[in-house]
């Protein structure tokens, strides 16, 4: 899983450099980013299939891919935070999760720009680049910093931020950088790796 994300990240970083140049072009970066999304997904599927060739897939771009093993799934979001990527904002992540019999066994969130690998595995905890994660211990919401999507940011009495990348928001909750996360529209490929990382840390997220 980690090797797959690292290999795919090379393509992401290269294309992100090109996206920044396309911001001022007449054609714009939209088609280019769509191709990047699909290419990264293709790399992840190929790499993950090398170690577990019979596992099935649930992906953002392709949808469900059934293989011989229909109890084990790789869940993939090639680029979470696509809008950020599209506009040349360096805040997005590659997300992978392993689901077995409808239970998440492990999850990964990789920020290729900052080279931060958030990884969690059942009964083994959650880590950032091999360092054990610790959530915030704050008890008062007045001292907390939360993150949300636009439609969920209706809490005027809270310190709220909107980063544009749900995966990193939840990873930041798990690592104590953020104190909570609110999101009202999320798909299975958006949440499974992040959810697993965060659940292991028992954060406040709704």
Annotate each language-model stretch with its function:
Residues 68-127:
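DPxDG-like acidic metal-binding loop motif
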Residues 1-79:
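N-terminal subdomain of lithium-sensitive/metallo-dependent phosphomonoesterases centered on the IMPase/IPPase/PAP
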Residues 38, 61, 78-81, 112, ...:
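Generic detector of well-ordered alpha-helical packing
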Residues 134-196, 202:
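An extended, acidic
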Residues 128-132:
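A structural micro-motif at secondary-structure boundaries
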Residues 12, 37, 48, 82, ...:
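Residue-level signal for inorganic ion chemistry
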């Amino acid at each position: 899983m980690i090797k797959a994300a690292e290999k795919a990240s090379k393509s992401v970083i290269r294309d992100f450099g090109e996206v920044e140049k396309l911001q001022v072009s007449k054609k714009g970066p939209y088609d280019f980013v769509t191709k990047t999304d699909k290419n990264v997904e293709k790399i992840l599927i190929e790499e993950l299939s090398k170690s577990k060739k019979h596992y099935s897939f649930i992906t953002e771009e392709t949808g469900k891919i059934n293989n011989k093993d229909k109890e084990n799934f790789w869940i993939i979001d090639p680029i979470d935070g696509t809008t950020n990527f599209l506009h040349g904002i360096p805040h997005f992540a590659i997300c992978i999760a392993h689901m077995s019999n409808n239970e998440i066994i492990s999850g990964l969130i990789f920020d290729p720009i900052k080279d931060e690998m958030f990884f969690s595995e059942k009964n083994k905890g959650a880590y950032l680049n091999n360092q054990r994660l610790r959530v915030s211990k704050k008890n008062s919401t007045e001292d907390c910093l939360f993150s949300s999507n636009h439609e969920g940011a209706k809490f005027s009495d809270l310190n709220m931020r909107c980063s544009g990348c749900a995966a990193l928001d939840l990873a930041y909750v798990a690592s104590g950088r953020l104190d909570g996360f609110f999101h009202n529209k999320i798909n299975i490929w958006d949440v499974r790796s992040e959810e697993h990382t965060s659940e292991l840390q028992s954060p406040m997220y709704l």
